[in-house]
Amino acid sequence: MATYKVRVATGTDLLSGTRDSISLTIVGTQGESHKQLLNHFGRDFATGAVGQYTVQCPQDLGELIIIRLHKERYAFFPKDPWYCNYVQICAPNGRIYHFPAYQWMDGYETLALREATGKTTADDSLPVLLEHRKEEIRAKQDFYHWRVFLPGLPSYVHIPSYRPPVRRHRNPNRPEWNGYIPGFPILINFKATKFLNLNLRYSFLKTASFFVRLGPMALAFKVRGLLDCKHSWKRLKDIRKIFPGKKSVVSEYVAEHWAEDTFFGYQYLNGVNPGLIRRCTRIPDKFPVTDDMVAPFLGEGTCLQAELEKGNIYLADYRIMEGIPTVELSGRKQHHCAPLCLLHFGPEGKMMPIAIQLSQTPGPDCPIFLPSDSEWDWLLAKTWVRYAEFYSHEAIAHLLETHLIAEAFCLALLRNLPMCHPLYKLLIPHTRYTVQINSIGRAVLLNEGGLSAKGMSLGVEGFAGVMVRALSELTYDSLYLPNDFVERGVQDLPGYYYRDDSLAVWNALEKYVTEIITYYYPSDAAVEGDPELQSWVQEIFKECLLGRESSGFPRCLRTVPELIRYVTIVIYTCSAKHAAVNTGQMEFTAWMPNFPASMRNPPIQTKGLTTLETFMDTLPDVKTTCITLLVLWTLSREPDDRRPLGHFPDIHFVEEAPRRSIEAFRQRLNQISHDIRQRNKCLPIPYYYLDPVLIENSISI
């Protein structure tokens, strides 16, 4: 008689436990046990419980390879979902086997789990294990499907179609499943979030935290009448009265210094969209800036051509915004532009704007604005640039290049890699809650009656159009961080804390990935010969990049260095890159004139006519301001249940080498965090968005 001691861990999140019956079957190389009910006197499988059980077998089962968890109805109780963390089994010879689950069992079902050692297809020889791999992938591909959200954008996780309940007093003008949360000013497509699989949803704690923060803020705006006010702001200082939540050093600094040229230039380096600016070596024909125009702003003893040759001239070009249509908000036509902004990095170490053109086509009705123009002309020209920056940030840098791409990475992972695959173990922590937050984003942002329809001048169609254009130009090289800085010519630009911190995190991450990859892939042949890996890469190319060859994204990977680069890009995109464009979002957008989502008057065509009154009349009205601010506040505040980069409480790797690599990675991140905090002590505006302590493992907000 062989005795196996079993430990079963239930998740710690509220409602993780179950009243259903749980049975276990153990499969080894020399046989399998009978199905045995795991049952003690009293409650089993309560939230946070680690139950200990004994399984008796007539003979030793040999090396344990698979277990089966059977979830069945208990007495008269209704179906009760269960979140299983892991199962550990101590064999008669004293060896401990670990079977990671970290997933929900929703209905009455059987879940087969493999022993935790990471293995590629080439590492498996037993027919039962090879068949298990195939069956797991087949089941996931039957369950998780790709779906086109909008043509030209990455595909996303299909939400099953449910017939809405019949309502006697249904509004025929409201799309099915759209509704309001009390006080919240926009429609939310509940179907996009309600029917997600449990394994893709927020935990109960995170869900509660998210909606508890949302409701009171919305109701406060509603009670004060702000969400019904379609008038212009009377005074700039009135905008400060709607600052949401707790103010910070940065948000206060933004409100005080937003109109200054030095802060305007600073945001291109260390704001929430720090990946746009590039060195300019030649003034483009479409932006006819002359030396006479800008010479007074370059300093003594120099000229525009000399500064171009020295590498001190930089360009922000918003050409991707050109020709996008606008909508009406609060009954008033909104306006749009695609500006160009020329900046100079002076000897005092500051990035300063020196010329702005509010169109991609020069002409008499499109003057070039200069710092020497009237105060309100220059300020309004800069505000138009900040308006374009809003869409460059929200549509491209934030939503497309992190959220939507990361969701495609996640779904391809689930559909093509079994849980025992080392890449699954490496990447799965970086997909946590991404599908859930993207479903919320689609329900709130890109929904008929949502934010883009009620708070943005481009509307749903225009906002999506910007992303479609950006995806058509996205390249693999641009996602490879070190190459991006070189390609934009900013690799040696002083005071670029985003670059310094992102490269530090990238290097730590790349070293960690290298150690893991080289442990499981000893040769290039091992990479090229892994069919599951190749299927994952191929599906990303097809569903995320839409099969566009010009993107430079690989269809397959042939060498170990290629795999290291690819995986590093994936993890960085899902963690640090998102933190860089998301964490500071509210601090830079809470003061609306610094980041307006709509403009109510056309771009100025004649100098000398702008006044405070015309400036205020161009900014968004009170209602639009509050709607935009409320939604951005909701979607930028990380709810509870956080997991900082490098913290992996779910144990997927059990081998000693990858465990050492994880610990070394954590130590490197701790050093980076210390260095960032020491540097920030000497800065007037601290840059902490890439402090590893504040970087989430995954895109979860």
Curated annotation (Swiss-Prot):
- Where located? Cytoplasm; Cytoplasm, Perinuclear region
Asked if Metal-binding is a keyword of the record, the answer is: yes
Describe the reaction catalysed, as an equation.
(5Z,8Z,11Z,14Z)-eicosatetraenoate + O2 = (12R)-hydroperoxy-(5Z,8Z,10E,14Z)-eicosatetraenoate; N-[omega-(9Z,12Z)-octadecadienoyloxy]acyl-beta-D-glucosyl-(1<->1)-octadecasphing-4E-enine + O2 = N-[omega-(9R)-hydroperoxy-(10E,12Z)-octadecadienoyloxy]acyl-beta-D-glucosyl-(1<->1)-octadecasphing-4E-enine; a N-[omega-(9Z,12Z)-octadecadienoyloxy]-acylsphin-4E-enine + O2 = a N-[omega-(9R)-hydroperoxy-(10E,12Z)-octadecadienoyloxy]-acylsphin-4E-enine; (6Z,9Z,12Z)-octadecatrienoate + O2 = 10-hydroperoxy-(6Z,8E,12Z)-octadecatrienoate
Q: Which cofactor does it need?
A: Fe cation
The organism is: Homo sapiens (Human)
Q: What class of enzyme is it?
A: oxidoreductase
Protein name per UniProt:
Arachidonate 12-lipoxygenase, 12R-type
The root-end lineage is: Eukaryota, Metazoa, Chordata, Craniata, Vertebrata
Pathway of this protein? Answer: Lipid metabolism; hydroperoxy eicosatetraenoic acid biosynthesis; Lipid metabolism; sphingolipid metabolism
